[in-house]
Amino acid sequence: MPYLLEMKNITKTFGSVKAIDNVSLRLNAGEIVSLCGENGSGKSTLMKVLCGIYPHGSYEGEIIFAGEEIQASHIRDTERKGIAIIHQELALVKELTVLENIFLGNEITHNGIMDYDLMTLRYQKLLAQVSLSISPDTRVGDLGLGQQQLVEIAKALNKQVRLLILDEPTASLTEQETSVLLDIIRDLQQHGIACIYISHKLNEVKAISDTICVIRDGQHIGTRDAAGMSEDDIITMMVERELTAIYPNEPHTTGDEILRIEHLTAWHPVNRHIKRVNDVSFSLKRGEILGIAGLVGAGRTETIQCLFGVWPGQWEGKIYIDGKQVDIRNCQQAITQGIAMVPEDRKRDGIVPVMAVGKNITLAALNKFTGGISQLDDAAEQKCILESIQQLKVKTSSPDLAIGRLSGGNQQKAILARCLLLNPRILILDEPTRGIDIGAKYEIYKLINQLVQQGIAVIVISSELPEVLGLSDRVLVMHEGKLKANLINHNLTQEQVMEAALRSEHHVEKQSV
């Protein structure tokens, strides 16, 4: 039986650099292939070649789809063949309705007039295929990210897709939304639709894939049956080394209490009747890693936003640092108290994309380079930038490169470098490894361990329970704004954490002292 897709000996160069070096990939109709590799390995370049974003003639090699050679000059050419790609940054127009987005560029017309009756009938069939029940007049911007992802798939199905490429489709989805998406992909597979799945979440890769293809440094390392591979096998192929412990568990001792929060309550910024955080109290010791776990909407991010002075609504409660009550109502006051934070959404809140990597690093600590005068000491700033880039292993061709051009992992390391310039005593990490590859994750985990060995207290908020359990000395479990458990991490399991989160009563387990 002929393959649906064959990419033969693809090579793509940028100047003297080979981004893709003689890579081949093939898959059958209805097959799900996961494409794995660190950021910068060449995955995205290979997919851009396949989709016509890099046109025929700009690369070497051959692409055969459904028995015919593709020589695409534009992404529309491959879409007509039945190839569709859905990027991590969704390509929906938020101000248009769901129906308008699905048919954008593929409108059904009759005598030059759009036939809304036919489009509505087609719309209902498409949404049934992705298990959505939404009015066609609903504005896309009013949907959650999980629903928007399914609208993108429905849009692809409207183009008679035969090969669906999903690039980090669950990076911003909840576990429930992820489960729905994976079920839909499996259902599409039963209808003969093939899928190339790109994700850093190896548990998803294992769960969804028939075959796993690994690319490293632009080269094809190997393609194997998913059933015969463990997550450790995938990691070793990706990074060319064994990460014997993904979560470095280097010994560190905790000191005395540095932070205490008492009876913290925060209200919705618009609706004062809704409590986003409800009477939460906890403490933190020097050199301790405190994890905060809970489902989406649990109040984790809202809690630490109050601590850092950036919660947009009203809140009340008491914050003590070194036993002294402090008033923190903005981020500058938090920084003055020795608190730094890596935000949940790095693109929205963590970086200035068009600004240089170096300037992003020093952005919050410019007073270090003024020496009491208004003029910056450029030499001192540049020295600090280079030291930070080296210390955090930020991969960039130049400190002057716009940070928006870096991979997610390197953007995150630059944000961490900025935080460390503030000499924090308390470091808050909200989703510290979201959307970054396993190698960058490992480096960040090692850094966290180094920081607590220096006596810095760290708070980690993560939607990935294995990450919380792998890093934390102690775990707070939140649900619907309430603190449900305060657990010492003596071989805690995911089941124990979820059980604590979903208890109907408000019960805080007593912690060891």
Curated annotation (Swiss-Prot):
It is a peripheral membrane protein. GO terms for cellular component: plasma membrane. It holds the Pfam family ABC_tran. SMART domains: AAA (SM00382). It comes from Shigella flexneri. It catalyses: D-xylose(out) + ATP + H2O = D-xylose(in) + ADP + phosphate + H(+). Keywords: ATP-binding, Cell inner membrane, Cell membrane, Membrane, Nucleotide-binding, Repeat, Sugar transport, Translocase, Transport. The complex is composed of two ATP-binding proteins (XylG), two transmembrane proteins (XylH) and a solute-binding protein (XylF). SUPFAM superfamilies: P-loop containing nucleoside triphosphate hydrolases. Gene3D superfamilies: P-loop containing nucleotide triphosphate hydrolases (3.40.50.300). GO terms for molecular function: ABC-type D-xylose transporter activity; ATP binding; ATP hydrolysis activity. Part of the ABC transporter complex XylFGH involved in xylose import. Responsible for energy coupling to the transport system. This is Xylose import ATP-binding protein XylG. The lineage of its organism: Bacteria, Pseudomonadati, Pseudomonadota, Gammaproteobacteria, Enterobacterales. It is an enzyme of class 7 (translocase). ATP binds at G37, E38, N39, G40, S41, G42, K43, S44. It comes from the Bacteria. Belongs to the ABC transporter superfamily. Xylose importer (TC 3.A.1.2.4) family. It is found in: Cell inner membrane. The keyword Endoplasmic reticulum does not apply. Its EC number is 7.5.2.10. Residues 5-242, 259-505 form the ABC transporter domain.
